Amino acid sequence: MSKPVVSVEGCEAPEELVIIDEKIGDGDEAKAGDVVDVHYVGVGLSDGKQFDASWDRGEPLRFTLGVGQVIPGWDRGVQGMRVGGRRRLEIPSSLAYGPRGIPGVIKGGETLIFVCDLVGVTGR
């Protein structure tokens, strides 16, 4: 897979996590406690601008799923993906960085849109 283009056109701020499978993978399924490798692009809903992308660093993000190493929207949204899959996550600020945001990077109260590619799963 290659770096996705993330569009916010026609997207409204959700109150709950929105999960859209763009491609269902055929590899191992990601479960809580697994170490996962995820390539992603993240944009803010308000301006559609990219604030982060693992693709630009040439290396996926590795984390343990479901233990709070990432924002809650990711812990919930990546679970159930299969290796080789691509999923769009529309994450309300309550499941991201909340009213404070990340100064200079993400505005307070911002809805975040991620397109995530699950590239690896390692068992517990």
Regions found by a protein language model. Name each.
Residues 1-124:
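Cross-family detector of peptidyl-prolyl cis-trans isomerase
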